[in-house]
Swiss-Prot record:
It comes from the Bacteria. It holds the Pfam family AvrB_AvrC. The gene is avrB. This is Avirulence protein B. Keywords: Secreted, Virulence. It comes from Pseudomonas savastanoi pv. glycinea (Pseudomonas syringae pv. glycinea). GO terms for cellular component: extracellular region. It is found in: Secreted. To avirulence C protein of the same strain. InterPro entries: Avirulence_B/C, Avirulence_B/C_sf, AvrB/C-like.
Amino acid sequence: MGCVSSKSTTVLSPQTSFNEASRTSFRALPGPSQRQLEVYDQCLIGAARWPDDSSKSNTPENRAYCQSMYNSIRSAGDEISRGGITSFEELWGRATEWRLSKLQRGEPLYSAFASERTSDTDAVTPLVKPYKSVLARVVDHEDAHDEIMQDNLFGDLNVKVYRQTAYLHGNVIPLNTFRVATDTEYLRDRVAHLRTELGAKALKQHLQRYNPDRIDHTNASYLPIIKDHLNDLYRQAISSDLSQAELISLIARTHWWAASAMPDQRGSAAKAEFAARAIASAHGIELPPFRNGNVSDIEAMLSGEEEFVEKYRSLLDSDCF
C-alpha cells in the first residue's frame, strides 16, 4: 500500500452537457495505485470490526464481501481520476450499485438498500448486538449529560444523552442523538415484567422503535442541505492541487458528513466508507482498513467534525501517512 502521487494532466471533453462541461477543466488524478493492499487487508475493507464477539470480520462470507468492496472502490477511483464521476451524488450511486450487487433482487431488504430516507419516517437503531459496545462509550462520553426520558411502558428513566451537532453556513444542524439508560437494574426487571404482561412479540415491536438504549438518527429533512455540502466537499477533494494533508482532511470530512447523515434506509455506513476510499484511490492512495475495534460510522457519529478529522489517520490500521 502506498501514498502515491503523480503529475496530473488535463482531460478535455467535447460534450456540452452540464456534467461534461464541468470536466473540460478537470485535471486528471493519478488513479489507483499499482501497489495494492495485501490480500489480508483487502478482505477487511468495509468490515465492521466490533471490539467484542459481535465482530464477524474474519468469516469467509465477510472476507469475500470486503474484497468485492475493495475492488469496486478501485474501479470507482479510476473513474473519478479520469473525470467520470463529477459529483458526490454520482459517487454515492456507484456505492449503491455495488451494495445492491451483494443482494438478490427481490430480497425483503433490497429496496431499503436502494432507497433514500424521507422526512415522514423515523430512523432508529436500538443499541443491542452488535451495538452493545457503544453503551459504555455513550455513558462515558465527555459531551453526554443526564436526562429523564419518558416512555409509556417504562415510565421515567434516567438516561445519558449525547447529541451530535454540526455547523453549516452559520447554522447548527442537529445530527444523531444517542440515549443509554442508566437505571439498568430497574430496566431489566421492567423488561421481564412487560414480556410476561404484553408478550414477547409486542415488547419486541415497542423496543424496535422506543428502546431506551438507542440512536435517533439525523432527521431526513436536513438531507438536502447536507447533500449539497457533500457535493461541495467532493468538488474540492478531486482537485489535483491538494497537499496530502488537505486531501486527507477532505476525505475525513466527506466520510464524517456522509456517515453522520445516514442518507439511505439501509447501507449508508458501507456507502460512506466506499465514497471516502474511492476519493483516496483516485489520488493514488490505498487507505488501509480501520483498526480492530473502530467501526467507522460509529466513530463518526460519536465525534464532532473537527475531532473526527483530527483522529482520522489514527483510526486506520497503518502508519502509511
